[in-house]
């Protein structure tokens, strides 16, 4: 299953940012900035961005921690990491980011290494959510926070119906035009499988986080899980 998901993200790498704009109605940048603020990341911190994709959150984190800080961007898609590296190289001054090809279920970092962490639109695609949160807990320093942002199924039936219509009538046809229809058709079933906010909180507490709160965003079509070690 992991290899199948990795292959999907390798194929969509060239249009990943464009499709994120469509999926979020252009709002993902606002939500990412909000997630970073929730982590409490500050200048000089060592931070982690899991499932970093094309590097958007990692670059934002790097601006937050500044030249005295350090960010590690982790993804299992080599193609997306290459896109992230190219984006970083076009920045001035050069951000202090290490790009790491790795699986979030087995992070290549020491215990208690990071001051803050983010994950944007990645948890829903992880094959073992408890294991990924357990690994995140391991590498965070005591009292460190993480913010995990992702799409969700809203509880309200009207918004749920709108979300499904938008996916079926807007996102998938646009993905089809870009040659990645099959890759983006997986989103709807992935939303159906994804634990709701309350369940995410329960999982986070069970693996050892001292506090966990889930905030619905965009009428429940999005959410952010804030967890503290």
From Swiss-Prot:
One annotated GO biological process: phylloquinone biosynthetic process
Signal peptide as annotated in the record: none
Pathway: Cofactor biosynthesis; phylloquinone biosynthesis
Catalytic activity, EC: 2.1.1.329
Reactions the enzyme catalyzes: demethylphylloquinol + S-adenosyl-L-methionine = phylloquinol + S-adenosyl-L-homocysteine + H(+)
GO MF assignments: 2-phytyl-1,4-naphthoquinone methyltransferase activity
Record keywords: Methyltransferase, S-adenosyl-L-methionine, Transferase
InterPro entries: MenG, SAM-dependent_MTases_sf, UbiE/COQ5_MeTrFase, UbiE/COQ5_MeTrFase_CS
Xref: Pfam families: Ubie_methyltran (PF01209)
PROSITE patterns documented for this protein: SAM_MT_UBIE, UBIE_1
Gene3D superfamilies, per the entry: Vaccinia Virus protein VP39
Record family assignment: Belongs to the class I-like SAM-binding methyltransferase superfamily. MenG/UbiE family.
Summary of the function given for this chain in its UniProt record: Methyltransferase required for the conversion of 2-phytyl-1,4-beta-naphthoquinol to phylloquinol.
NCBIfam families on file: MenG_MenH_UbiE, PRK00216.1-5
Protein name: 2-phytyl-1,4-naphtoquinone methyltransferase
Organism: Nostoc sp. (strain PCC 7120 / SAG 25.82 / UTEX 2576)
Record gene name: menG
